[in-house]
């Protein structure tokens, strides 16, 4: 009886090990234009972004689970169009932001925003 309980406890705890933790990149990350563009524009210099090579920045907020967030920079509603606008021209939405204008085109910002919105 004790061995059955021990086995059940081990299985239950093992199952919980996968709960919580940090969100992972979507399965399509390696094929996503948005992920490639985030790497190209060096977003990972400041941000940690799951699925983007070398995106382990610690200067700015992690973008893991960006798709679940209600606000961008704590002020701007996190919709796809607003996120794309933020990426392309952050100071137009939050004039005192520390996020620099990286020269991201509107089309590239749309692709990056779509990728980030998929991070849940």
Q: Where on the chain are the PLM-derived regions?
A:
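Generic structural signal for secondary-structure transition and capping sites
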Residues: 43, 71, 91-95
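Electrostatic cytochrome c docking/interface patches
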Residues: 20-39
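Inter-heme linker and motif-flanking segments adjacent to c-type heme-binding CXXCH motifs
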Residues: 22-27, 52-54, 72-73, 118-120
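The canonical Cys-X-X-Cys-His
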Residues: 34, 40-50, 99, 112
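C-terminal motif of bacterial Sec signal peptides marking the signal peptidase cleavage site
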Residues: 15-18
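Bacterial N-terminal signal peptides that target proteins for export
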Residues: 1-7
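Axial heme c-ligation environment in periplasmic c-type cytochrome domains
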Residues: 57-66, 86-119
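Gly/Gly-Pro-rich "capping" loops immediately C-terminal to redox-active cysteine motifs
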Residues: 31, 35-37, 48-84
């Amino acid at each position: 009886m004790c061995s059955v309980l021990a086995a059940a406890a081990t299985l239950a705890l093992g199952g919980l090990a996968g709960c919580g933790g940090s969100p992972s990149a979507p399965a399509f990350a390696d094929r996503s234009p948005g992920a490639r563009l985030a790497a190209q524009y060096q977003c990972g210099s400041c941000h940690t972004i799951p699925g983007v090579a070398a995106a382990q920045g610690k200067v700015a907020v992690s973008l893991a689970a960006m798709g679940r967030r209600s606000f961008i920079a704590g002020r701007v509603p996190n919709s796809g169009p607003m996120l794309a606008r933020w990426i392309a021209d952050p100071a137009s939405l939050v004039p005192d932001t520390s996020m620099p204008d990286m020269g991201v085109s509107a089309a590239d910002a749309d692709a990056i925003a779509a990728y980030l919105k998929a991070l849940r």
